[in-house]
Amino acid sequence: MPPDAYEIVRPAILLGGLSARGLHVTGQTAGPIWPSASPPEAAIALHWELGDVAELPRVRAELRRHATRDDPGPMDPDLLDQLILALDEMASNALRHGGGSVTATVRQTPDAYLVEVSDAAIHAPPSPAVGRDPSEGGLGLYLIAELSTQHGWYVSNGHKFVWALLPRA
């Protein structure tokens, strides 16, 4: 594997069968890593209606402010960066590829943040990029799958919801 390739250490469907080790994202995957599943229950903390990727710097700043000021305990800086990265990747994917109205919501459980983004592309499940050089981008969904303790997607009321659960501590 090239040294700059990103490797997922989760089971994945590969051409030729199931791999317990993971996959090499330069093009060997034959199936999605985002299961169709409902998220766990969580209380709403923040919500945004988004229309353009130019809004994402403000959204990231609001999330950082909330997590450092309003959260009941100090958050590890690395976990905070991972939370912000997940929201940014999921929202930018929805804005670029999803169409229709896009919403982003961050919810809280006692030990995690639930990031949930919706768009109107109900027939387009989250599909990590395959068959391309990692330097061309498209690794956001792989990265979020690795950072999260759970992740999935579902369709409800004419919208697709993509979600990831990220630890708070």
Regions found by a protein language model. Give the residues of each.
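Conserved beta-strand-loop-beta-strand hairpin that lines the nucleotide-binding pocket
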Residues: 1-51, 95-169
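Short, well-structured hydrophobic secondary-structure segments
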Residues: 86, 91-96
